[in-house]
């Protein structure tokens, strides 16, 4: 695919390719459809699957379309798979994790600890928006 010759991909270009997306209702899919303006894209070729990102990566490795991989998941790919990754051109999408609990929830220490564990598990550079990123 000519996408492999690009160093970055503009969100407007994505609609020209066979896309492997998670099922409707999955937040990652919904955010990408919004960011890339795919909802009403003419001639869009979507493929939905109950499969996983790993399954979609195998399709892409075989030359059968394109998919999206979250940055955190991309950090775990093999060197060969990483060579297939192309970042979005600016602005790049970013996602936000929000912890929500009922105002009467009494175990604030549990929520605080969960927040700490999440922040420790995520690379430090991913804890804040970086220049050129846009929340989706």
Predicted regions and their residues:
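Short aromatic/hydrophobic contact patches that present stacked aromatics
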Residues: 18-20, 47, 98-100
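Short beta-strand-to-loop elements that line the ligand-binding cleft
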Residues: 21-22, 42-52
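Secondary-structure junction motif
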Residues: 3-4, 18-39, 107-116, 122-133
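Conserved beta-strand edge residues that scaffold enzyme active sites
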Residues: 28, 50, 73-74
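Beta-alpha-beta core module
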Residues: 4-9, 13, 54-104
């Amino acid at each position: 695919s000519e996408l492999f010759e690009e160093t970055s991909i503009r969100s407007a270009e994505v609609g020209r390719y066979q896309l492997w997306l998670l099922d409707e209702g999955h937040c990652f899919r919904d955010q990408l459809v919004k960011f890339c303006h795919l909802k009403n894209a003419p001639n869009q070729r979507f493929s939905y699957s109950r499969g996983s990102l790993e399954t979609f990566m195998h399709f892409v490795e075989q030359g059968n379309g394109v998919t999206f991989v979250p940055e955190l998941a991309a950090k775990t790919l093999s060197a060969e798979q990483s060579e297939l990754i192309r970042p979005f051109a600016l602005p790049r999408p970013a996602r936000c994790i929000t912890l929500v609990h009922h105002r009467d929830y009494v175990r604030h220490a549990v929520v605080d600890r969960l927040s700490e564990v999440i922040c420790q598990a995520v690379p430090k550079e991913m804890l804040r928006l970086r220049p050129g990123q846009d929340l989706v």
